[in-house]
Structure formats: structure tokens, C-alpha cells
Amino acid sequence: MPSRHVFQLGTALSDPRTPMTNAYLFLLAVLTVLATPGPTNTLLASGSAVAGIRASLPLLLAELAGYLIAVDLVGFLLRPLLAAQPVIGTALKIVVALYLAYMAIQLWRRTGQATSGQAVVTWRGVFIATLLNPKGLIFALAIIPFGRPEVPFYLLAFGLSVVAVGFLWLVAGHLIGAAAGERRRLVPRIASVALVGFAGLIAASAFG
């Protein structure tokens, strides 16, 4: 990647006042943020590791719905409010951290209670985790150029990217589960620990 593009990407991601209007940088930023490990991707991978790719495909719709609602809500309605009242952003981080901790407990319990092949990650769980995912703020404030007439096309490209990257996480989870063999049910347990870690990082950023 040319150094100029690296600089532009870093500038846009660090400054919410500079949403991306260059299609190349837009796709690069979206794919980079989506591919980064986080709560949603952790749930997708752990669900696929236990239930398989086909049974986990509905989770992609949950992820897509969660991201689109979150991004549109922030991009069209909450941008001025978040800029004027930073305390709201802090409160949102605390809520996200608490929910991820709750999700970690639920995932750990369901893993122990579920029978072989039964899904341990639910549609609702992925939807809410994605709706509250801090990545949504990054997309809405720093990447998607809200306010421009072509924003519907950016949202379409964003939605397609969500499904594509999410599917790759399902594949990755399935491969991890296949490699783990009979120990595949440990994958959601590991994922629950990861969710606790994400919750801690988000809580720390809220009070830092």
C-alpha cells in the first residue's frame, strides 16, 4: 500500500470530522475494521466452530442488521449529540462493557448445557453484540460519509463487506472447530474469556 494511502487512512480513522469519500480508502478502511477481532467476530467464529457454517449463516443477517441500525442511528441522528455531549459516549461504552460481560457468562453457561451440535451462539446475541459494537461508532463517525448524496451506495458497499468478512469468520471458526475435534466445545469457552477481555478494554477506555 502506498505510504500516502496509509497516512490518509490513519488520518481519517483518527479524526471523525474526515469521513472517507475515496472509494479505495473507504473499502480498505471498512475491510480492515471488520476483519479486526472483536465481540461480533468472536461470536461468529465460536458459533461456527460448534454448529458448522450452514447452521451459522443466519448469524450473518444478525450482524448485518446490527451494524446497519447502529451506523444509521449514529450517522443520521446522533452525530451532533455525541459531539456536544462526550459523556454520552462514555455512558455507551459502559453499557457495552456490561453487556459483553453478560454475553460472556451466557456463552459459558450455554456451552455447558447444550447437546452435541446444538448452537451455543444465538441470533439475538449476535444482533445485540453488533448493535453495541464500538466498531459501529468508527464506521459512522470516521468512515461512512454521511451527508453526501451518494451515501446509499457507501452503505450498500458497507453491507456487502459485512456479509463477506463475516462469512470468512464463519469459515475460520469452522476450521478451528474441525482442528479441535472433540474439543471443539472448548472454543466457545475460550470465546467467552475473550469477550471478558473486550469488556475490560472498553470499560478501561471509558474511564481512561
Regions found by a protein language model. Give the residues of each.
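Hydrophobic residues within alpha-helical transmembrane segments
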Residues: 28, 61-65, 69, 88-91, ...
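Small-residue-enriched transmembrane helix starts and helix-helix packing motifs
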Residues: 7-36, 57, 116-132, 150-163
